Amino acid sequence: MADPTTYRPAPGTIPTEPGVYKFRDENRRVIYVGKAKNLRSRLSNYFQDVTQLHPRTRQMVFAASSVEWTVVSSEVEALQLEYTWIKRFDPRFNVKYRDDKTYPMLAVSTGERFPRAFFFRGPRRKGVRYFGPYSHAWAVRETLDLLTRVFPMRTCSKGVFNRHESLGRPCLLGYIDKCAAPCVGRVSEEEHREIVDGFTSFMAGHTDKVTRKLNADMMAAAEELDFERAARLRDDLEAIDKVMEKQAVVLGDGTDADIIAFATDQLEAAVQVFNIRGGRIRGQRGWVVDKPGDYAGLLVDATTQPEGDAPETDPALPFLMQDFLVQFYGDAVERAETEAKEDAAVIERRGVDKHSFEEAAPVTRASVVPREILVQVAPNEAEQTLKVLEELRGAGVDARVPQRGDKRALMETVERNAKELLKQHKLKRVGDLTARSAALQELQEALDMEQAPLRIECTDISHIQGTDVVASLVVFEDGLPRKSDYRRYRVKEAAGDGHSNDVASIAEITRRRFLRHNQDKLAVPEAEEFDGSTFSDEKVEEMSTDARRFAYPPQIFIVDGGAPQVAAAQEVFDELGIVDVVLIGLAKRLEEIWLPGDPDPVILPRNSQALFLLQQIRDEAHRFAITYHRQQRSKRMRVSELDSIKGLGQSRRTELVKHFGSVAKLKEASVEDISQVKGFGPKLAEAVYEGLHASK
């Protein structure tokens, strides 16, 4: 790995114009591509104090051995060249939104002589047109089942097709009119292609055109007294209605739009895209990617990273949005143009009538880049990004943040899906046995432990400006949460008068937890104490079950914070003689691991299973603490001054407030006024008056 100072450009050699730059490693491979309004200003950030760089950026500059740049005439050109180079070089430190191969799709093999429709999951192939993605496999199969009643195109494999072609009789679908049976010549190649065109046109969103044609044909058949055909067309319309019912209208104005939202944490970002066509959700997909730290303005400001509760506050979000818009729609247009070329080749090779083929609503730039793009936040360099999108579409694009109404509500739905995607991704990383074993093994090695940790505990403090100060203690055993051992605390000594000392709070909770450990250890009898007469089986079970949870210390005890919190907890360990527990602090912002007495933190790799496990434990402690804090705050806010008055039950308190309107107005009342309330005599009225005015 090269020291960045060894390849730093000489002063004054970097131009100040807009441009795109490449970092290369010692093997001349491009490892990172970036753009800049001012190349000199941007590149100089990489060669300052490397300790101040974001961890991922720091890793990149040490992996590189040279840097190159290309000057361009405008920021829009820089954005386009950056996208081109990322596609060409596939740099490992750039964010790349690759196709997720797990989403089910509905595919049509347009390159075959008799195209077929089929369920598909995997990398895209040439000569196939895709619709979706769908959230569930059953949705693909159900859609296909309903639409083949209207568009009886081939759905069988090549082997099944060839077998029935040689037998001279169709399969079951041919007999029940869910396939036009081209295998036995019931329809010609051109007639089958027209059926396929209708199917793809419907799937591309041209539903009104299809339903109008079917309705007109049905009416014409009825006028000609061809009631059998009219009934069949009526059934086709009902089948289409069923498909449409399953795609509920979410935007009543029939909008074509894409809705895009992110959810982020310190290390990763999840993005969700909902495709709305004709006001209905036609597709949904998502990605989870590593979040780089070298965006302009964030290169050295890594401490501003969010905790994950409010992604809209993440300063990296506009940059993520810009990268995604350019990559996502650039790739979509490239695929559309490739499919158009393949379709043209089919026309030429098969001799299909071009006019009928174009009726199938071919994929165009305008169909993959919609007129309206609703985004969670405005992208970085919004004007330049919009110009790139308009060039990709070949027409105007309206990219904006919805503020109210149905579109805002739909954006909130997409945001929730993005958060759920990120949550499920993080759980998946630590949920399976292999990943958990690897995480525990990595922790053992990183912390120089003799054995992999079986039990890990973590504490977190929660408060608002020193009020309702509480703490949580969560327990993970074998990498999984053990919720029966969770504990929550009200901080006593370190809280009060509107201020809270987080360091003192950590010390208090650590002391209380390990004092309990020492007490429980004494409460569990040693093996030699059991002689069969001193304790009954029931007594032994009662004693050990109640005490065993905290009689044995964790192998790792995590405090939420950095060096000060770790030092405070270590003082408690020294005071109580705790020597068999590894104490660490996990700093939220940079995900650094602090050990007692060490001047520098331990940095785990971003893709480390151990780091994901520690994050999950810390986040669980935070969730448990903040939930308890909210409960305490709500409880305090519900407490009334009337609660402290003896002899005043709930019904009488309610009657007083109902009579006077509020406690404030009740305070203004005299003893005589209070005694006028039903159920209040002079003695009780006097007690209420004294109780309210004594509390001042």
Swiss-Prot record:
Any Gene Ontology CC annotation: cytoplasm
Any one GO biological process: nucleotide-excision repair
Keywords: Cytoplasm, DNA damage, DNA excision, DNA repair, Excision nuclease, SOS response
Localisation: Cytoplasm
SS bond list: none
Residue ranges annotated for the GIY-YIG domain, each copy included: 16-95
Tree of life domain: Bacteria
Domain (UVR): residue spans on this chain: 208-243
Regions annotated as coiled coil: none
One example GO MF annotation: DNA binding
Keyword hit for Ribonucleoprotein: no
Subunit structure: Interacts with UvrB in an incision complex.
Listed PANTHER family: UVRABC SYSTEM PROTEIN C, UVRC/OXIDOREDUCTASE
Entry function: The UvrABC repair system catalyzes the recognition and processing of DNA lesions. UvrC both incises the 5' and 3' sides of the lesion. The N-terminal half is responsible for the 3' incision and the C-terminal half is responsible for the 5' incision.
Family that this chain belongs to: Belongs to the UvrC family.
Full protein name: UvrABC system protein C
Natural source organism: Corynebacterium glutamicum (strain R)
